[in-house]
Amino acid sequence: MKDNISEEEVRKFNKLAEEWWNPDGSFAALHTLNPLRFNYIKNWAEINKKKCLDIGCGGGILTESLSKYADHVDGLDMANKAISVAKNHQELMGIKNITYHNSNLEKFVEINHEQYDVLTCMEMLEHVPSPEQIIESCSKALIGGGHLFISTINRNIKSYLMAIIGAEYILKLLPQGTHEFDSFLKPSEIEQWSRKSGLNLIDLTGVMYNPITKTFKLTDNVSVNYMMHFRKE
């Protein structure tokens, strides 16, 4: 199987690694978004004392939130500098139930043969060459009845204007060049791939940003940012 890795994306996020835990830095939007996405996960899945895998964990923002409830969390990312930052912050916070891995998902699943109650794949699918391959591996890593949570960006004119022009160039919520329009994904594409891998769609919810209040909220509008919840058969 060909490595499902974009070296350009890895370099991009390695350059930003020291910014991960700066709430006013390049990942400020993720710090603002994190409580919303974490509560979404908690509302749909029981994570207390469960085993979780955070795919594309970066510096560990969501990983640490999951660790407050889960029995154990594995965090996975291809950006080695982001993993170093995540490990350092884990040590600083005295967290014992996280293990970070500098690996891609496919190799991790092949080597570890572990199965998880909850998988999170947030703001990650749009950064790999084959998102379908990621979803297939997610299914392999889940127990029967396990939960998969995905968040990404829709592909249409509105999402280009808002997620790239607006977020990166006008509001400067993200560094310029964070996203490529051609890598955005329609919910129907993700659902089709997931169904092929034995994952059933439970929920599809939009995420909207208010530039005046600088807050995120859930919405029925999935035209730009959205989250999906799947369960394995």
Regions found by a protein language model. Give the residues of each.
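Acceptor-substrate binding/catalytic loop of class I
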Residues: 172-189
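A conserved beta-strand element that flanks and buttresses the S-adenosyl-L-methionine
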Residues: 120
